[in-house]
Amino acid sequence: MNASFAPSSSFVAGLRHDWSRAEIKALFELPFSDLMFQAQSVHRAWFNPNEVQVSTLCSIKTGACPEDCAYCPQSARYDTGLEKEKLMAVEKVIEEARAAKASGATRFCMGAAWRSPKGKDMPYVTAMVKGVKSLGMETCMTLGMLSEAQAQDLADAGLDYYNHNLDTSPEYYGEIITTRTYQDRLETLDNVRKAGMKVCCGGIVGMGEEVLDRAGLLQQLANMAEHPESVPINMLVKVGGTPLEREADLDPIDFIRTIAVARILMPKSHVRLSAGREQMNEQTQALAFLAGANSIFYGEKLLTTPNPEANKDMQLFNKLGIKPEAYDVHETEEEQEAALVHQLEEAKLDAFFYNAAR
């Protein structure tokens, strides 16, 4: 949160954790201009509306995931043509982080396609955290489910953020995933909080869900005892070979409504415009920023789907008068990072990238 845009006491007092599904549905049903005005008003009370947080993401282990998430090309259950890669060497990860820092990065996110890390993996991932932290960078990981002990190990290594998405509403969840329960996800988030790390948690829209399911997802997030510091809102990226490859496109206005409602419900969180941004034109992205999105992944790729080229991002920022949010080493409540250009993976994976942070 930008110190020069500190919220008023009335907005602080207005933070809620008791939203009903009916209240959230009513927000979704507001006339579009009214919803956008309300979201932008909340956004301006907490953030500089002309700054967007910029993140980068490195896949440290790609493919061969045993889960059956219907949207994800990293699942071993689907023939998507994605080539699996084993865990990246610690030295290589640190080299990637060093290159990212040289390009202006202040925060480095690492993702692995696992159901959960095995005991033999933990020394390597904690070494990655320590190595990246030694460069003076902020760190984030997404490795699947975590036990209390694993979460504590990551926290002890210095990990700042852990990403674990809920994906959708509790009611629709079974249509998308059967190999991991909703409660499994909530327990991992509890373990992350208990260990003292910050939470990055959101979901995916456009998977065939109803408006009530989007309301249900946001209700789960907004009614947590502490709002996630980062809330990624992903638009489904349809990848050939996955069960959702022929899913109907979500209307962009419905996507913008989801961003706006997320901003209203979670005023102090960074709302991240994440996967699916490549399919969005400049006008849709501009509306998303107006609705309260203030974080993006920057660079050529996410984990398994293409991402808009970095120079295009900066061109759009220039058109809109947006600047990358500066990182303040004295502020630890919210993610803060500067713009960066960083090659994330080999070109052979270009057709198969998707933000598989789960």
Curated annotation (Swiss-Prot):
Keywords: 2Fe-2S, 4Fe-4S, Biotin biosynthesis, Iron, Iron-sulfur, Metal-binding, S-adenosyl-L-methionine, Transferase. One of its GO terms (biological process) is biotin biosynthetic process. InterPro entries: Aldolase_TIM, BATS_dom, Biotin_synth/BioAB, Biotin_synthase, Elp3/MiaA/NifB-like_rSAM, rSAM. [2Fe-2S] cluster binds at C109, C140, C200, R272. CDD domains: Radical_SAM. GO terms for molecular function: 2 iron, 2 sulfur cluster binding; 4 iron, 4 sulfur cluster binding; biotin synthase activity; iron ion binding. It comes from the Bacteria. Residues 50-277 form the Radical SAM core domain. It catalyses: (4R,5S)-dethiobiotin + (sulfur carrier)-SH + 2 reduced [2Fe-2S]-[ferredoxin] + 2 S-adenosyl-L-methionine = (sulfur carrier)-H + biotin + 2 5'-deoxyadenosine + 2 L-methionine + 2 oxidized [2Fe-2S]-[ferredoxin]. Binds 1 [4Fe-4S] cluster. The cluster is coordinated with 3 cysteines and an exchangeable S-adenosyl-L-methionine. Its EC number is 2.8.1.6. The keyword S-adenosyl-L-methionine applies. SUPFAM superfamilies: Radical SAM enzymes. Its cofactor is [4Fe-4S] cluster; [2Fe-2S] cluster. Gene3D superfamilies: Aldolase class I (3.20.20.70). [4Fe-4S] cluster binds at C65, C69, C72. Pathway: Cofactor biosynthesis; biotin biosynthesis; biotin from 7,8-diaminononanoate: step 2/2. PROSITE patterns: RADICAL_SAM. Catalyzes the conversion of dethiobiotin (DTB) to biotin by the insertion of a sulfur atom into dethiobiotin via a radical-based mechanism. Homodimer. Belongs to the radical SAM superfamily. Biotin synthase family. This is Biotin synthase.
